């Protein structure tokens, strides 16, 4: 019984340490990316407005107008990472 308990505790500790190592690696990658890369946030918005007008004739011969407005709005967040690279020119002229 004690052996089973020790085995499960050992595997649990290894599992928790593995998750902690994975999270630490992800944080380090994110920190390096944010330090070396300039982020440009772009927001792309699509808006479509459709108006439908329906004229219906009622039972008394009276006309009824029904207007339906469909507003379709899409917002897309796009992040572009552009590396901060400096382009240097090599000087090959002789003095």
Swiss-Prot record:
In which broad location class does this protein mainly occur, judging by the first location in its UniProt entry?
membrane
Membrane-traversing stretches: 4-24
Q: Which residues lie on this side of the membrane: Cytoplasmic?
A: 25-95
Keyword annotations from UniProtKB, A to Z:
Cell membrane, Cell wall, Cell wall biogenesis/degradation, Developmental protein, Membrane, Secreted, Transmembrane, Transmembrane helix
Q: Name one GO cellular component term.
A: extracellular region
Which InterPro entries does UniProt cross-reference here?
TED6/7
Summarizing the function annotation, the protein's role is: Involved in the secondary cell wall (SCW) formation of vessel elements (e.g. protoxylem and metaxylem), thus promoting tracheary element (TE) differentiation.
Describe its partners and assembly state.
Answer: Interacts with the secondary cell wall (SCW)-related cellulose synthase complex.
Name this protein carries in UniProt: Protein TRACHEARY ELEMENT DIFFERENTIATION-RELATED 6
Source organism of this protein record = Zinnia elegans
Originating gene: TED6
């Amino acid at each position: 019984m004690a052996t089973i308990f020790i085995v499960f505790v050992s595997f649990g500790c290894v599992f928790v340490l593995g998750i902690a190592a994975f999270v630490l690696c992800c944080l380090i990658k994110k920190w390096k990316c944010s330090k070396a890369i300039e982020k440009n946030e772009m927001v792309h918005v699509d808006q479509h407005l459709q108006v439908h007008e329906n004229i219906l004739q009622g039972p008394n011969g009276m006309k009824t107008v029904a207007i339906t407005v469909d507003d379709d709005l899409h917002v897309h967040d796009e992040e572009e990472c552009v590396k901060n690279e400096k382009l240097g020119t090599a000087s090959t002229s002789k003095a």
